[in-house]
């Protein structure tokens, strides 16, 4: 067990996870600017891209590259500097560190070494898109980028098709049409989806419709910019595999309680899942759980 007290005096340096704007420089926070000014080093996914940001805010702190191609080599170097007392900020090209970039491995290494990790709140494409999508904002399931190979992509989509939560994906412009075709095949043409592009920028755009409607738009439009895809969850899906029969020895009340404790669900959500697994009406499970009747 490791209990971190983020702002107590430390014998080592601190790793700061600093989010950067996803398109609009006005989304940079005062705290992020101050942190980047005060740390000893900035570990950047792309030093050239980050230098533009630093120049804009007149930040003079030195950088070191830290990306998927050199992360294993760099982690040891960064840990050594942190252990020697240096404070380091880690930034991605845009948005929140550790989300679809190698920052997670550095965080794990810091925790294993007893080094304090301090996250700063800020810009994030997934949540920005979700709250304006019009689809259910919770529960949601963030997946990120789908696999590149079609076979692997189809398999991933088949798994996602079982999920009742709203699903969040990232996608590049040159793959968008093919991904939408595969989504239509697996999820069904009538599944609701929202494409979000150029978030926070001048040409920010939301395309809302069914998969068939959105695919038709993509076939006849110029596809530019990075996309965030928000897909409606499967209302018939379940968070838990049907073949799991470990609940057979439990009462309905015990089953609901187990769901709440093990999967951090509210009673309403747990009752819904228990009803699916046991093939009962939700009203029956509700009554049994609350000892009604």
Regions found by a protein language model. Give the residues of each.
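Loop/turn-to-beta-strand initiation segments
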Residues: 14-15, 85-89, 165-166
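Conserved helicase motor
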Residues: 66-72, 146-149
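Short glycine-rich anion-binding loops that position phosphate/pyrophosphate groups of nucleotides
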Residues: 22-23, 93-97, 173-175, 234-236
């Amino acid at each position: 067990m490791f209990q971190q007290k983020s702002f107590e005096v430390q014998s080592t340096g601190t790793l700061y996870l600093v989010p950067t704007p996803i398109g609009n420089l006005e989304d940079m926070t005062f705290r992020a600017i101050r942190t980047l000014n005060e740390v000893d080093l900035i570990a950047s996914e792309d030093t050239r891209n980050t230098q533009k940001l630093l120049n804009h805010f007149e930040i003079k702190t030195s950088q070191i590259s830290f990306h998927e191609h050199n992360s294993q080599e760099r982690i040891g170097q960064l840990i050594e500097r942190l252990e020697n007392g240096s404070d380091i900020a880690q930034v991605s090209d845009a948005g929140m560190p550790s989300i679809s970039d190698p920052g997670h491995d550095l965080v794990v290494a810091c925790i294993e070494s007893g080094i304090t990790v301090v996250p700063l709140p800020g810009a994030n494409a997934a949540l920005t898109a979700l709250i304006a999508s019009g689809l259910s904002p919770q529960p949601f399931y963030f997946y990120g980028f789908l696999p590149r190979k079609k076979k692997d992509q189809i398999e991933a989509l088949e798994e996602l098709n079982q999920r009742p939560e709203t699903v969040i994906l990232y996608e590049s412009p040159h793959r968008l049409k093919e991904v939408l075709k595969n989504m239509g095949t697996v999820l069904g043409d009538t599944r609701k989806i929202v494409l979000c592009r150029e978030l926070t920028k001048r040409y920010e755009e939301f395309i809302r419709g069914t998969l068939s409607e959105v695919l038709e738009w993509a076939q006849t439009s110029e596809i530019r910019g990075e996309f965030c895809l928000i897909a409606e969850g499967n209302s018939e899906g379940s968070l838990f595999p049907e073949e799991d029969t470990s609940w057979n020895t439990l009462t309905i009340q015990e089953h609901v309680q187990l769901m709440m404790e093990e999967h951090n669900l509210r009673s309403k959500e747990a009752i819904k899942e228990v009803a699916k697994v046991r093939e009962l009406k939700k009203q029956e499970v509700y009554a049994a759980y609350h000892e009604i009747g």
